[in-house]
Amino acid sequence: WESASRSMARLDGKVPYIISGGNHDYGYQKSENGRTKLPEYFPFERNSCWRDCLVADFPNRNGDISMENAAFEFHDKNWGDILVITTEFAPRPDVLDWARDLAGSEKFRGHKVIAMTHSYLKQRSAEYTKNTSYKITPQTSGKDFWDKFVSISPNVVLAVCGHTGKPGDFEDAVAYRVDKNTAGKNVHQMMFNVQISGGGWEGNGGDGWLRILEFMPDGKTVKVKTYSPLFGISPSTKHLAHRTGACDQFDMLIDF
């Protein structure tokens, strides 16, 4: 926790970064229960950039207010109003109700909504995750996240997650799909989890790969790129810093 906090401190006061709690952020090792140190190490007041964009929150499993279930509002001259809603790992049914009601509220129903959660899509196949084997309870699945929040919220345009993956090709660390919501609009859904790239579970921790989303000035195109600053910083490896395969770079056309 202290190491993660020190690393993220470089962004405090500079970037309104948003955290989506994962399975290893709960319990003793992997979500044996709902105990977490997220409120202790990442309180809302630690980053001054959250002051003007944090607009809503919902208590975590211990009744504490934290980054686990929170919403952030952004305004852009080309993209208009954007609301980012992040939820805890395997969110409780009440959390999905809160997220759905918030997205559909009078204040935010005209916003483009980006939904974040940890476990949502399986690697490569992009199937929705089912109920997990983790002991944390109550919990919902990726399929529930789609059925009970994303698909029935007409203004959710993008959902992003991590979590799944297996040693193998880079394609085993990513997933992408587009589905129609109940309003007939396209919803882009993307999983990115490169923790096993560069040596497997006990390897190099992902070789620094980042998934970059560039929101273009036309207000409807999002360019997706995959870049590693670890490779990019060295003249001897910078030629490896950009992945250019079909699963690494593509455009998303936002339907709103």
Regions found by a protein language model. Give the residues of each.
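Extended active-site neighborhood of metal-dependent phosphoesterases/phosphodiesterases
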Residues: 1-97, 107-108, 169-191, 211-212, ...
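Generic beta-strand hydrophobic packing signal
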Residues: 85, 159, 225-227
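Residue-level recognition of alpha-helix boundary/capping or hinge positions
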Residues: 4-6, 55-62, 76, 109-112, ...
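Alpha-helical scaffold elements lining the catalytic groove of polysaccharide deacetylases
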Residues: 101-103
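Active-site neighborhood of phospho(di)ester-bond hydrolases with catalytic His/Asp-centered motifs
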Residues: 16-22, 87, 114-118, 137-140, ...
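Binuclear metal-dependent phosphoesterase catalytic core
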Residues: 167-256
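Solvent-exposed loop/turn segments at secondary-structure junctions
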Residues: 23-28, 88-93, 119-124, 163-168, ...
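Active-site-proximal segments of metal-dependent phosphoesterases and phosphodiesterases across multiple
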Residues: 93-97, 106-157, 171
